[in-house]
Amino acid sequence: MLKWHGLAGNKLMTSNVVGSIHVVGKDHTFTGMEETPVAFVEWKVPSFAFADRKTQEGYFEEAINIVHEMSGGRQPRDRIFINVVHAVDGAWNFNGKAVTNAEIGAEVAKAG
């Protein structure tokens, strides 16, 4: 994800990307009201992230490919769903302190 925002290798952002895996049985996931094995990728990010179309398209294609390949090709690409949840400006935190988008930008620039 950082690559698509021009932040690959940025120490501050790398240390603040947090992920989790939630395994949900296929008998608990549905599309069209039918049990369907699906995969979800979700990001919770500051409100400026994923703002341009090139980043959205590039990241989504790459993430879908990764999930599809990790499944050994068993997970259909059309059953891999991605969404991005934006935090309100000021409702993000670094080191236990709420920060605004401007403060994030300043910290990212300092971290190089």
What is each of the regions a protein language model found here?
Residues M1-G112:
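A domain-level signal for the structural core that forms small-molecule/cofactor-binding pockets
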